[in-house]
Amino acid sequence: MEQFTIHTGLVAPLDRENVDTDAIIPKQFLKSIKRTGFGPNLFDEWRYKDVGEPGQDNSKRPLNPDFVLNQPRYQGASVLLARKNFGCGSSREHAPWALQQYGFRAIIAPSFADIFFNNCFKNGLLPIVLTESQVDHLFNETQAFTGYQLTVDLDKQVVVTPGGTAYPFDVTAFRKYCLLNGFDDIGLTLRYADQIKAYEAQRLAKMPWLAHKLVG
């Protein structure tokens, strides 16, 4: 998993409340057995005018010019600004996969659905909770100024505006440690690979029959 320390990026404002995971990545794209390739279908029903299906050539599909991610000024955005209860609905992990694979590194909102919030941390995506008034201010600035960027400093736990205003945010010590070091669940486990191997060797020495395969 990619480490997250300090990130400065263009902000895209998604001015909708209660964005659910089916809007983030529609159900038909969950058929894939891979965990890659979801970025092109992020917010599929909002980005395109037709109904998307897995395997389509998205370059030939009609775009919705009014949707924020299709507007030229927000191309290349890596910080998503959202409204309350972002990520509600089903618990599909494909939602943070799609957001990350599109290019987002952080999401700022007044609140998140709990399971989505947890899945973000497990996949290297930083969800940041700010107050509604702070989020309102960021929406106003993002929409008023083309090329509006924010700096997210995970170590200091602040979001910094171009004017130097710093908004502090909370994150648990464990989640912060994992993001700073790029550890997902597997990465955390592999830190103890030597101890695991030593335990398995010791266990098999005491109970060698466990190494035998059953026949029949």
Swiss-Prot record:
<dbReference type="InterPro" id="IPR015928">
    <property type="entry name" value="Aconitase/3IPM_dehydase_swvl"/>
</dbReference>
<dbReference type="Pfam" id="PF00694">
    <property type="entry name" value="Aconitase_C"/>
</dbReference>
<dbReference type="InterPro" id="IPR050075">
    <property type="entry name" value="LeuD"/>
</dbReference>
<keyword id="KW-0100">Branched-chain amino acid biosynthesis</keyword>
<comment type="pathway">
    <text>Amino-acid biosynthesis; L-leucine biosynthesis; L-leucine from 3-methyl-2-oxobutanoate: step 2/4.</text>
</comment>
<dbReference type="InterPro" id="IPR033940">
    <property type="entry name" value="IPMI_Swivel"/>
</dbReference>
<dbReference type="InterPro" id="IPR000573">
    <property type="entry name" value="AconitaseA/IPMdHydase_ssu_swvl"/>
</dbReference>
<keyword id="KW-0028">Amino-acid biosynthesis</keyword>
<keyword id="KW-0456">Lyase</keyword>
<keyword id="KW-0432">Leucine biosynthesis</keyword>
<dbReference type="GO" id="GO:0009316">
    <property type="term" value="C:3-isopropylmalate dehydratase complex"/>
</dbReference>
<dbReference type="GO" id="GO:0009098">
    <property type="term" value="P:L-leucine biosynthetic process"/>
</dbReference>
<dbReference type="InterPro" id="IPR004431">
    <property type="entry name" value="3-IsopropMal_deHydase_ssu"/>
</dbReference>
<comment type="similarity">
    <text>Belongs to the LeuD family. LeuD type 1 subfamily.</text>
</comment>
<protein>
    <recommendedName>
        <fullName>3-isopropylmalate dehydratase small subunit</fullName>
        <ecNumber>4.2.1.33</ecNumber>
    </recommendedName>
</protein>
<dbReference type="GO" id="GO:0003861">
    <property type="term" value="F:3-isopropylmalate dehydratase activity"/>
</dbReference>
<comment type="function">
    <text>Catalyzes the isomerization between 2-isopropylmalate and 3-isopropylmalate, via the formation of 2-isopropylmaleate.</text>
</comment>
<comment type="subunit">
    <text>Heterodimer of LeuC and LeuD.</text>
</comment>
